[in-house]
Amino acid sequence: MQLNASEISSFIKDKIADYDNKVENKAEGTIVNVSDGIVQIQGLSQAMLGEMIELPNGNFALAMNLERDSVGAVVLGAYEHLREGDKVHCTGRILEVPVGRGLLGRVVDALGNPIDGKGKIDAEGSSPVEKIAPGVIERQSVDQPLQTGLKAIDSMVPLGRGQRELIIGDRQTGKTAIAIDAIINQKNTGVICIYVAIGQKASSIASVVRKLEEADALKHTIVVAASASTSAAMQYIAPYSGCAMGEFFRDRGEDALIIYDDLTKQAWAYRQVSLLLRRPPGREAYPGDVFYLHSRLLERAARINAKEVERLTAGKVKGKTGSLTALPIIETQAGDVSAFVPTNVISITDGQIFLETDLFNSGIRPAINAGLSVSRVGGAAQTQIIKKLGGGIRLALAQYRELAAFAQFASDLDEATRKQLEHGQRVTELMKQKQYAPLSVAEMAISLFAADKGYLDTVAVEDIMAYETALLSFMRENHADLMNTINTTGKYDEAVQTGLKEALDAFVEKRSL
């Protein structure tokens, strides 16, 4: 074959012209050990804490231990295929999850991947799972109510938008039920809800999703599921992922509610990861930074002022504040609130709703202990009519519990004590509420008005719930305008007071016929 010199010259020139002199500098390391979802990597001296490390199959690991000659990373996903000697690379990125309205009505895993079989998610962007909480200057005081629809909570331990209120109690005391009722009650309020399920049975999560669908509440809710079958790393990350999704709405001048169900299991998952990484154990074998684990998460729930919203949206949203309200759940063992994780979370949050097994088993549901439950900032945000009418409820219940214990030993009681006991029994009965049946502000106000003004004093204790149902039905049929006024304004003026008195007098008269 005859080679032409000019052809060879042209070929070489073309190759030189096409040559790209770009050098790609990639930090590469080698896996030296794989066990229980943890990889030890050598040669990644440039790795940063919390950085994503690319694994051979396209999966990622999270760098959590930076040692002198190796990096300890936790694998996000399957790790069975990883072998000693596999090459890994630094990415220079931190973990991000998809955010936006496209997530509403969907069930996703801790990384934001859909697991509900409804196809791809149309996200508006992505956000880092770890973010610094808003500073003091960016915050605004809590002064807007967040109604749960539960009489016992909205009257005694009111919640405000931007608050952190702990729900604490033993297993099977109705903690999740309170959270689900709160989500259902936000249906037409414009509040976006995020439900983060951590370490729960997949069947329990499916049951919650089905209940939200039945109540038509899934369309304003994002469910982040890290079930008991997922890795400890996923259970540890899930709350931060859910928080990032909620912050998207908060930073755009909207209101969001996030429920962490529950943070005890997240602490267990973090303890497991920390022990596998050979971190030194402390009290109850938790690592030294378990307080920071929860404080950096819960401090991100806040109400931010209009100026900060305007800055975050580059001037697109003006004159609106944004809020992220958190309802973390903690499971106690045999009512022990002095354990490590419960005391940590109690000290971080703005109050707690304490649920008792004894109350639950005696049929008082929601099983809220009025004496131990408190809302430190919600009082400033409480609706006026509920604040005025519900003021005596907590006192009546606290006095009743005290007197009931004393009355067990007393043979004869004076008239005043007997009346107080009877009033307490009726109030206790009135505070009972069926699951998945949240009440509006007006319905709540009517029930509290009846208790406050003595309308229940002539009703037998066992008939209180039936009396309340009949009363609310009567009000909906005959006094819808008054109820609309209460729901719209939330005020307790003379006109509302007169209207309620006339309505209840008419109901009593009708009932006596």
From Swiss-Prot:
Residues where ATP binds: G169, D170, R171, Q172, T173, G174, K175, T176
CDD domains assigned: ATP-synt_F1_alpha_C, ATP-synt_F1_alpha_N, F1-ATPase_alpha_CD
Membrane spanning residue stretches: none
GO cellular component: plasma membrane; proton-transporting ATP synthase complex
Keywords: ATP synthesis, ATP-binding, Cell inner membrane, Cell membrane, CF(1), Hydrogen ion transport, Ion transport, Membrane, Nucleotide-binding, Translocase, Transport
Membrane topology: Peripheral membrane protein
Self-association state and partner proteins as the record states: F-type ATPases have 2 components, CF(1) - the catalytic core - and CF(0) - the membrane proton channel. CF(1) has five subunits: alpha(3), beta(3), gamma(1), delta(1), epsilon(1). CF(0) has three main subunits: a(1), b(2) and c(9-12). The alpha and beta chains form an alternating ring which encloses part of the gamma chain. CF(1) is attached to CF(0) by a central stalk formed by the gamma and epsilon chains, while a peripheral stalk is formed by the delta and b chains.
Annotated family: Belongs to the ATPase alpha/beta chains family.
The protein, known as: ATP synthase subunit alpha
